[in-house]
């Protein structure tokens, strides 16, 4: 059995830290905590009223996918990963991550609620897993892995693909809107969320490196290429990015580029060997190690959480 999955009677107590790399990842997540109340979406309505019907259609469908997908990720964490993984440091990360995914889902739901006034259309978007075939296909793929009998390692890769590949093209499309100066609330929340998901992806890669018996390269490549083809179809056929003025072929290449970064992080050879076609995505977390935590998106990071100084309590201060 994998050491990180072996029964651990000490799992209820955090100290002493055994896995410092995993603990540091948890502290990074903690330092980047945010809430929806801190995102100003009041100025988005003016832009929303100006964008074309095609752009509205695209944004609504992307938000509908995102609103549902975070719930699927959380179900996997609650039903599988949180019960399987026995090391405290990883359980801390997964527990915190569930709260973050709830915030993401609330943010997307709030954006839909703000932009869309018709109650029937709102319900249609909030129930995208049942109402939209293009969203259902991605949701079904993710949900299949929650209940799969495959080992933890394979499912770890599948959910890294969900957050690293299924989200990547949609993140890029919203950053494209930012490049055009549109929807500041949507685009700022997208920065925060893409940073979070970049960290979640990095965490999956870190957990993969702690496996003594990881899935084979062939298995990993199969899962990743499957996710790539579904995401490419989603953004070039089902919900083509040309609706917002992006190039579909470049989007296909970008998704392959992101997949290569993921498989490289896992320690395997690249599959597609392509370059990033989107210059505006050069510094985005899902692409790799530009480290949003040092850059601090929107100057947003909890004060002192990542401080390296010893946390000693002292009574020798002069009053």
Curated annotation (Swiss-Prot):
Cofactor binding mode and count: Binds 2 iron ions per subunit.
Protein name: Ribonucleoside-diphosphate reductase small chain
Induction details: Expressed early in the viral replicative cycle.
Lineage of the species this protein comes from: Viruses, Varidnaviria, Bamfordvirae, Nucleocytoviricota, Pokkesviricetes
Keywords per UniProt: Deoxyribonucleotide synthesis, Early protein, Iron, Metal-binding, Oxidoreductase
Cofactor(s) required, per the database record: Fe cation
Organism whose genome encodes this protein: Vaccinia virus (strain L-IVP) (VACV)
GO molecular function annotations of the record: metal ion binding; ribonucleoside-diphosphate reductase activity, thioredoxin disulfide as acceptor
Pfam family, one: Ribonuc_red_sm
Encoding gene per record: OPG048
Family under the similarity heading: Belongs to the ribonucleoside diphosphate reductase small chain family.
């Amino acid at each position: 059995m994998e050491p990180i999955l072996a029964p651990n009677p000490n799992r209820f107590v955090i100290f002493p830290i055994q896995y410092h790399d995993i603990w540091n990842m948890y502290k990074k997540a903690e330092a980047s905590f945010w809430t929806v109340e801190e995102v100003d979406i009041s100025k988005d309505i003016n832009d929303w009223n100006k964008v074309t019907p095609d752009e509205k259609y695209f944004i609504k469908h992307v938000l509908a996918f995102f609103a549902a997908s975070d719930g699927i990720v959380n179900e996997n964490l609650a039903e599988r990963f949180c019960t399987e993984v026995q090391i405290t440091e990883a359980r801390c990360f997964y527990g915190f991550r569930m709260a973050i995914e709830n915030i993401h889902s609330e943010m997307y739901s709030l954006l839909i609620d703000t932009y869309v006034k018709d109650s029937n259309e709102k319900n249609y978007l909030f129930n995208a897993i049942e109402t939209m075939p293009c969203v259902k296909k991605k949701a079904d793929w993710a949900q299949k892995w929650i209940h799969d009998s495959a080992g933890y390692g394979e499912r770890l890769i599948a959910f890294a693909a969900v957050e690293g590949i299924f989200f990547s093209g949609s993140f890029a499309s919203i950053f494209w809107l930012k490049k055009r100066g549109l929807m500041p609330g949507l685009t700022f929340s997208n920065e925060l969320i893409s940073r979070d998901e970049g960290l979640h992806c990095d965490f999956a890669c870190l957990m993969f490196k702690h496996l003594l018996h990881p899935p084979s390269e062939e298995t990993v490549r199969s899962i990743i290429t499957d996710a790539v083809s579904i995401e490419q179809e989603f953004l070039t056929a089902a919900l083509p990015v040309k609706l917002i003025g992006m190039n579909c072929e470049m989007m296909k290449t970008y998704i392959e580029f992101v997949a290569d970064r993921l498989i490289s992080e896992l320690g395997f050879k690249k599959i597609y060997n392509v370059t990033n076609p989107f210059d505006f995505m050069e510094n985005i977390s899902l692409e790799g190690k530009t480290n949003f935590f040092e850059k601090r998106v929107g100057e947003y990071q909890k004060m002192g959480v990542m401080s390296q100084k010893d946390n000693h309590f002292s009574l020798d201060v002069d009053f």
